[in-house]
Amino acid sequence: MKFIIKLFPEITIKSQSVRLRFIKILTTNIRNVLKHLEDDTLAIVRHWDHIELRTKDDNLGPEICDALTRIPGIHHILEVEDRSYSDMHNIFEQTLEAYRETLVGKTFCVRVKRRGKHEFSSGDVERYVGGGLNQHIESAKVNLTRPQVTVNLEVDQDKLILVKARHEGLGGFPIGTQEDVLSLISGGFDSGVSSYMLMRRGCRVHYCFFNLGGSAHEIGVKQVAHYLWNRFGSSHRVRFIAIDFEPVVGEILEKVEDGQMGVVLKRMMVRAASQVAERYGVQALVTGEALGQVSSQTLTNLRLIDNASDTLILRPLISHDKEHIINLARQIGTEDFAKTMPEYCGVISKSPTVKAVKAKIEEEESHFDFSILDRVVSEAKNVDIREIAQQSREQVVEVETVAELADTDVLLDIRAPDEQEEKPLKLDQVEVRSLPFYKLSSQFADLDQSKTYLLYCDRGVMSRLQALYLREQGYTNVKVYRP
């Protein structure tokens, strides 16, 4: 099986040295993402205008293709088949054999790309093959403007490349071509989308989480960060830094005037994140702030928040409205996480200012004990995001993991609804119930607690984290199902 990986167009307009560097980084990223397949026949070769991937194991094709569509820097992926040919008529015969069933009752056009010296042009092949297909498939009709099927062919020297399928890529720049950033992640719609946008633009995104809601909140945000990394950024190692911000919030509640609390809290977060960024050599912070969305996100307040630190703050969503942000979250798969993620920042100020005055803010901050901020930063927990899955195993070691089910057990499929539809879970003589992970906290108590519930997800990370959460809530009738 062979894939031709086409580069994001902005890469192709770079200078020769930059373009070669980007292609080299993208090739390395692809290798890193696919190394878990342990396929000895996998070969990846970079060229000037594309990257070629081959494997002898056809069963891995769908998994490889799915992974490639989630790697930044790729415009599209062509699933192709190499063949030899003798002349233009032979090209037509092979194309007819490959596309006859596909074109029945459809409109079509033929598009050809050619490399090398030949006695014919690309247009010659398009007309000859297209005319032949039109004659030999009676129900097929040519439509050059809006065809239902596009027959893509490539003639490379003495090889005919039949394009069996085209898959759209993520676009953007390969991760690692730009410098590292630190995302202030809360688990909501905005921070998840802003993190994704910087990954897509070529940045390795580390995560900084300010914990205001205890272990349950931290577990939820870890799920979001791990999901984003695993889905779009697993080519690189990244950090997840958790800072216990409850002492800072307590000091603000005690020392700062009500109306100024929101801006002061954001300034404290920026100060703390800047210290973390400096410690690890990160160049910029990323937030999910959008202009005018909440009281602290007016231009006046954002300017005051920026002034708390010299570190560059990037706000990729600054001009986006909430509906658009939610749509983006739905596209990348973080919507379900964000729907049930509690928002703690908004509860600390009853009448927040929308136009803070610098002198007033500084006066309020003069009452603040900054040793508390320094202490929570020094005590921050820093983990490799790849260890989150391992940590979840260690944290729920008291939660039994089983591979077989008893007749009286109830299997809870906690995957998102779209995942359940794509890969339905059916087991003989076992009751299977659907309860997505984001509804567990609110609906698990409604279940019959005399039964034992086995939580299932594809990779086992989400089920372990949710099992830990339920155990913390006092439920002992929970296990993890790993077939």
Curated annotation (Swiss-Prot):
> Where are the active-site residues found?
457
Protein keywords: ATP-binding, Cytoplasm, Disulfide bond, Nucleotide-binding, Redox-active center, RNA-binding, Thiamine biosynthesis, Transferase, tRNA-binding
Q: Its gene?
A: thiI
Q: What is this protein called?
A: tRNA sulfurtransferase
Cell compartments where the protein resides? Cytoplasm
Q: What does the UniProt record say this protein does? A: Catalyzes the ATP-dependent transfer of a sulfur to tRNA to produce 4-thiouridine in position 8 of tRNAs, which functions as a near-UV photosensor. Also catalyzes the transfer of sulfur to the sulfur carrier protein ThiS, forming ThiS-thiocarboxylate. This is a step in the synthesis of thiazole, in the thiamine biosynthesis pathway. The sulfur is donated as persulfide by IscS.
UniProt EC number: 2.8.1.4
In terms of SMART domains, this protein maps to:
THUMP
Give disulfide pairs as residue numbers.
345-457
Primary location class: cytoplasm
Q: Which GO terms describe its molecular function?
A: ATP binding; CCA tRNA nucleotidyltransferase activity; tRNA binding; tRNA-uracil-4 sulfurtransferase activity
PROSITE patterns in the record, alphabetically?
RHODANESE_3, THUMP
According to UniProt, this protein's pathway is: Cofactor biosynthesis; thiamine diphosphate biosynthesis
Lineage of origin: Bacteria, Pseudomonadati, Pseudomonadota, Gammaproteobacteria, Enterobacterales
Per UniProt, the enzyme's principal EC class comes to: transferase
What processes does the entry annotate via GO biological process terms?
A: thiamine biosynthetic process; thiamine diphosphate biosynthetic process; thiazole biosynthetic process; tRNA 4-thiouridine biosynthesis
Residues annotated as binding ATP:
184-185, 266, 288, 297
- List the catalytic activities from the record: [ThiI sulfur-carrier protein]-S-sulfanyl-L-cysteine + a uridine in tRNA + 2 reduced [2Fe-2S]-[ferredoxin] + ATP + H(+) = [ThiI sulfur-carrier protein]-L-cysteine + a 4-thiouridine in tRNA + 2 oxidized [2Fe-2S]-[ferredoxin] + AMP + diphosphate; [ThiS sulfur-carrier protein]-C-terminal Gly-Gly-AMP + S-sulfanyl-L-cysteinyl-[cysteine desulfurase] + AH2 = [ThiS sulfur-carrier protein]-C-terminal-Gly-aminoethanethioate + L-cysteinyl-[cysteine desulfurase] + A + AMP + 2 H(+)
Domain Rhodanese spans what residues? 405-483
- What sequence ranges are listed for the domain THUMP? 62-166
